[in-house]
Amino acid sequence: MAISNNIRPGRHFLQIPGPTNVPDRVLRAMDYPTIDHRGPDFAELGLRVLDRIKLIFKTSEPVIIFPASGTGAWEAALVNTLSAGDKILMFETGHFSTLWWDIAQKFKIEVDFVEGDWRTGVDPNIVEQKLKEDKDKKIKAVCAVHNLSLIHI
């Protein structure tokens, strides 16, 4: 019996929604010197990019770039709008929603975590029911990961 050799020549390409491989032309562009992020060239480039990126997102509204991962954005959303002891309503829709739950708990936010099926989105009827049950209006926010490319919702 021959032993299989799993080593393949060339470069491996990761074929999942993210993180993604960096194309060669982008890697080559990184060979150029950086520009001063406080200088006029950077300001001009930034404004041009922000204006043109509207075409990609098919919007006429301003596009805001948040310099962090999605996890960083979740953390920022929690710490900039809530305090320890605040109550939130959160829904399980997949792996990322459970990570957001963990972040909330680390900030001592009280989480009403509604377990769910990773193959479906949040049921708006359950959101409505939970908010109606909150007679004292303790729920300060509703948190839901509503788009996971991994499970196609």
Report residues per predicted region.
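Structural motif
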Residues: 12-14, 62-65, 86-89, 111-112, ...
